[in-house]
Amino acid sequence: MISQETLLKQAEEVKDSVILHRRKIHRYAEIGGKEYKTHKYICEFIEKLGLPYENVTETAILATLDTGKPGPHIALRADIDALPLKENPDNLCGPRTCISEQEGTCHACGHDAHAAMLMGCMEVFCNLKDSLSGVIYFCFEAGEENGASHLQMLDALGRRSVDTVWAIHVYAALESGKIGIRTGACMAGFGGIDITVHGKSGHGSRPDRAINPVYVAA
């Protein structure tokens, strides 16, 4: 059993590198499915840690830490794509520490932080490998905003024995140092539904005998 003190110590040791990861990925800021610089940067870090990985799509990555001991198989997931938005060089407190270098694209939804935290988590678990059991999968999902890789990632995990999947999302409304967790849905996510609306034609003078599908669809 790894103590909380040990985990906090490890987290503190990788803090600076996590900040560096976040700033680098923030500057890259690439649209879903085209996160080429981000993909290269993450893969180089995974290789530095000596972990095997699979390119699930051109830019989505699934890395594996196998402790060699029986135990749960856990997947940890982070998204890595940015949004097609122009970034303001200033925030409410003053100039930003770093801004996107890609015109018209920026990390406005925190995916740079998600990826950086998962990279830090990966480093911590590699350092503590001898004290762990089971298998940990690190999922770097490309194109969360446009669905560029979620089906392929699910398929890749489906070909493995996975007991549980964990993911996080930054949330500015929470006080620093706290996390929010709840049963059921917590935030909106990428997805869609199809509906078919059946209208009924009629004369403009007798709308009461018609069914206007525009109102229903709206």
Feature annotation, model-predicted:
Residues 83-85, 96-106, 112-113, 128-218:
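Histidine/acidic-residue-rich, glycine-tolerant segments that coordinate divalent metal ions
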Residues 2-107, 112-120, 124-133:
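Acidic/His- and Gly-rich active-site-bordering loop/insert found
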